[in-house]
Amino acid sequence: MKSNNIFKKEILLIFISVFYSCSEAFEQEDIRLVLTGSVHGQLDPCGWKKNPLGGLPRRYTKINEMRENGQSPIVLDAGDMFYSTNKINTNNIKSEKHRCMTMLDAYDKIGYDGINIGNYELLTGIDYLINLQNKFPSLSFLSSNIKNINTDEFIFSPH
């Protein structure tokens, strides 16, 4: 029984020394992730009278503050950012496309690392999205479930 306790203590000491030495060998890195989503084309802060939140200018300022403080945030949008409505028609398509271009221009200036394609982004069709990706090559449009029907290849980067 006594030798069994010694054996357990030896295993515990080996376990602690291995994991302690491994933790010292790697430097920990701070990762900052800024995630937005379901923006629905809203450029300005929300309408609350007390402490209004959101808005592209505020987002731009906060993300730049992080960068100026030596942080390198990964900035992503989860999708549904382009349009203020899911009912695109001949009466509003011009204004909604203008809103979309304004959003993408702002996201480009903010320095977004990736934009997931949500259902709102699909309202004006794949060809329009491909055209937008070409106009804003520094923005990565992401989707792991939109494929070319003929080739089965991803239309946008899956990651």
Regions from the PLM with identified roles:
Residues 22-159:
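Acidic, metal/ion-coordinating pockets
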Residues 2-11:
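Bacterial N-terminal signal peptides that target proteins for export
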Residues 10-19:
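Bacterial N-terminal signal peptides
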